[in-house]
């Protein structure tokens, strides 16, 4: 029983790698610093969905690879950021901000970890089966060749699949999908 917190942490790491659902989305704003290109990634960051300058009008920022970023903005060009890349735990803005501006990030964030103090989160409330089967899978090396391990693996994979599919259905419910020309909006 001493290892149960370890099994929980390992199960959380596993489903944080597998899922990208609305319950994991977080929106935060940050202020740029004049003449400084880097911003720290938010705590719990997994993956960016959208990054924009909150100007009037709002200006979406384009992601580029670090290599392209270095070719375009490797020097000291300053102005209003239009592009960004992610290196290690930082967002690099290009061109380098000439003044203080507000950016808004929509990103996937890890679920809050369960602890002795924080005993609930979205996953344990809405999909406790993911925790159960994930913890059983992580405990398997210690229970030594339990014949139910394949059952646990299948149940875990099915639970993850069900959550992702439900989120996909919910995300696009309410109206028909359609192609939209957004060129006049920017």
Task: Describe each model-derived feature in a short phrase.
Residues 1-186:
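Glycine-enriched, solvent-exposed interface loops adjoining structured elements
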């Amino acid at each position: 029983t001493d290892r149960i917190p370890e099994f929980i942490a390992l199960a959380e790491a596993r489903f944080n790698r597998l899922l990208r659902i609305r319950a994991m989305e977080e929106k935060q704003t940050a202020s740029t610093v004049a003449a400084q290109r880097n911003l720290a990634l938010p705590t719990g960051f997994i993956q960016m969905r959208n990054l924009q300058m909150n100007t009037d009008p709002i200006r979406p920022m384009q992601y580029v690879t670090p290599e392209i970023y270095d070719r375009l903005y490797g020097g000291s060009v300053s102005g209003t950021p239009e592009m960004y890349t992610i290196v290690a735990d930082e967002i690099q803005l290009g061109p380098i901000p000439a003044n203080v501006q507000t950016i808004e990030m929509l990103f996937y964030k890890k679920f809050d970890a369960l602890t002795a103090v924080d005993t609930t989160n979205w996953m344990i409330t809405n999909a406790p089966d993911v925790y159960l089967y994930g913890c059983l899978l992580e405990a398997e090396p210690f229970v030594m060749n339990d014949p139910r391990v394949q059952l646990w693996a299948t149940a875990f994979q099915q639970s993850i699949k069900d959550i992702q599919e439900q989120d996909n259905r919910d995300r696009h419910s309410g109206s028909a999908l359609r192609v939209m020309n957004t060129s006049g909006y920017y």
